[in-house]
Amino acid sequence: MKRRIWAMAAAAVLGVSLLSGCGEGGPDAPPAAEVEEDGASGGNYDLSQVEERIYVLGHSGSAGSTNDFWGLTFAELVEEKSGGKMTVEVYNASQLGSDTSIAADVQANSVDFQITSPAAIPNVVKESAVFDMPFLFDTVEEAREAVMDDAVFDGLTDAFEAQGLKLFPLTDQGFRCITTNKEITGADSFRGMSLRTMNNPYQIAWFTAMGVAATPLNTSEIYLALQQGMLDGQENPWSQVYDKGLYDVQKYVTNSNHVLYVGCMFMGTGNWNELSSVERQIIWDAAQECVPIVQEYTDSYENEMLQKLINEYGMIYVDFDQIPGLREQLREETFDVAYESITGAIGNELLDQLLTVAGYGDMIPQ
């Protein structure tokens, strides 16, 4: 079916009409210890156990971004399922603070929900570094299958809970991709390149292994640094390249697909534990239903942004798939450094599980 919130978000960005639907996806419902599964059957909830309450959700995405669409979709689903008794107010564009500060407020139970990327909060739940392993996937479908693996999600759930956070089913904003002012023709093109990265120690480590002069900068600082010639390139989802106007200061856009930009939503365990079993089930079900809806929106939105970058703003598309062996070479150059830096921080169990699911079990050090 077509959801009202989808049309609202699309109109806010591009006026693009996107189809969405609810389907199976993500981990199973929470264990009975947290949610009484008979408290909700086929979407029929005992609303006598639901209190009227306003919840607060914060994120750093701009209006119309994937995270904003995700938050608004979640809010609509919660309202529908609760018969209007549970209202989620969504605050976008860092109105509640930075990703790190919002996460701290969620841990303190002063903000109810946050939507962000684990890569943006590496010091909050260190195990989320598992998704910083580069060049594992050729397609977004492969990446999503690995990320949604039950054992991977269970390990992350335990890690988030240890930090006072209840993790909900994961989704994503597509791949992060590199843009540059010089054409990429092979792995040697990266030697000596000054490239903006996230302020993420694991990604900085493996970008450095590629020969890149990794330069961590906040998103708001990228345009000026490129304009002044301080950087040769940067990496972000295509939508961020468009949203920040980087087409003015970058010539080439690629499908490097070096990491999936995983998205996560979580709640403080203090607030979670105060909810009734029905309220918890409503929230979990809404979060799980968001997964396929957000993925479909992401795919449409990111592809639309790429076409705009190429056709309207004249960026030149460099297809990594047409450069023989490029991703494989970059994977080999970065694997050991990435593996050692990540497992040095979080141990090897969770990363080994992801690598096995992704088809790289034979590359795991023995």
Residue ranges, per PLM feature:
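A gly/proline- and charged-residue-enriched helix-loop-helix capping module
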Residues: E141-T157
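C-terminal motif of bacterial Sec signal peptides marking the signal peptidase cleavage site
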Residues: S17-G21
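N-terminal secretory/targeting leader peptides
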Residues: G23-E141, F160-Q366
